[in-house]
From Swiss-Prot:
Keywords associated with the record: Antibiotic, Antimicrobial, Defensin, Disulfide bond, Secreted
Physiological role: Has antibacterial activity against the Gram-positive bacteria S.aureus 1056 MRSA (MIC=1.25 ug/ml) and S.aureus NCTC 4163 (MIC=6.7 ug/ml), and the Gram-negative bacteria E.coli O157:H7 (MIC=0.96 ug/ml) and E.coli 0111 (MIC=6.7 ug/ml). Does not have antifungal activity against the yeast C.albicans 3153A.
Localization: Secreted
Primary location group: secreted
Disulfide links within the chain: C3-C29, C8-C23, C13-C30
Family: Belongs to the beta-defensin family.
Name of the protein in question: Ostricacin-1
One Pfam short name: Defensin_beta
Taxonomic source organism: Struthio camelus
Entry superkingdom: Eukaryota
GO biological process: defense response to bacterium
Amino acid sequence: LFCRKGTCHFGGCPAHLVKVGSCFGFRACCKWPWDV
């Protein structure tokens, strides 16, 4: 459920980030490509 070392975004991830999971089920967990 938690997004470790990433950021939570409503909807999709910004173009420069990679989706790696979800935050609390309804938000996207995004990380920088070099942090994935």
